[in-house]
Amino acid sequence: YTLTAEIHYPTYFHRRGMVAAAREGDKENPEWRSDGSQFYIVWGKTYGGGMMERIRQRVKNSTNPPIELALEHEDTYWEVGGTPHLDGQYTIFGEVIDGLQTIDEIQLAETDENDRPLYDFRIIKAYILKE
């Protein structure tokens, strides 16, 4: 099953530790509907200097309608890291606020040909925090 996209960009963006709903590609899913059961935790890398300008152009040229990356996020991508090329295209619904070292370990797990871990990882405890 799928869910209506709830993209609240630039409020929520793909900095390291954010949790977002996976989805099918744009051709199969032009409404960007989110998968009801699959998600990803953003890791990415840090970006600096001219790299952000190249990513900004790439995103603008590859999205329809064109998405303009927010300049105010550049320091976060420089210091914390993330995946700016995904901004404005996926539903972000959570954030890892403790345990990023565990996420670092998960990303090193052995995977199959579809980049899925050979063994399942389970979230044992999650909390809903109000802003």
What are these regions (language model features)?
Residues 1-131:
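Cross-family detector of peptidyl-prolyl cis-trans isomerase
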